[in-house]
């Protein structure tokens, strides 16, 4: 996968050379390049922002600088090109006002050949930038990573990149390690809690069933704990489950947790 990142702080992404991300680049699974948006400016101050039209606080990133940069990285030969060239990357902008980035989005994007991320700063980027490239046939995505605001898009891009790339075949040393993770697959739940040795630490024991050697009981315990944790922390995920896909033990557990499971989707009895 090829990944291009545009930022006024490209050095921020040197962290991508560490850990599994760095190993994936060394193996040729990833090619990551960070570009400095100021390289496409033409004034002595290398300005990338201007005051907001209509007034207001802060500064807004200028569309003409972004367009020169994106035209080049997207392979547009001239501004009048009427459609995106073949093989155009998916163009992604972090935006706190956009839809939430989810594991499903990460899974979809992990199959892409080329991703291009644009990092906003200040009050953000001119809204015409994503609108224009959508009109040219580019697959433009805008995502939020949560209900909070950051100083810029670099942190959000790093979060999305890690979520996406770790799902690529060959990225993880043990591919089974992502199978039972939180939010993974259809009927996604939060993951069960994890333990390691020693069996007793500071008076707190690992649950006995995990030491039993009975894989069936261990699997059931973990599944029940995942259901219980999800019901407590993210009941919306329980409510989205397909009751037809639940086995008898799942139904029993959810009923004990106060959920009704006879309809298409579980419903809390207190609702």
UniProtKB/Swiss-Prot annotation:
Gene this protein is translated from: trmD
Residues noted as binding S-adenosyl-L-methionine in the record, renumbered to the chain: 120, 145-150
Protein name (database record): tRNA (guanine-N(1)-)-methyltransferase
Entry's EC annotation: 2.1.1.228
Subunit annotation: Homodimer.
Enzyme class: transferase
Entries under NCBIfam families matching the protein: PRK00026.1, trmD
Alphabetical list of CDD domains matching this protein: TrmD-like (cd18080)
Source organism per UniProt: Bifidobacterium longum subsp. infantis (strain ATCC 15697 / DSM 20088 / JCM 1222 / NCTC 11817 / S12)
Family from the record: Belongs to the RNA methyltransferase TrmD family.
Role description: Specifically methylates guanosine-37 in various tRNAs.
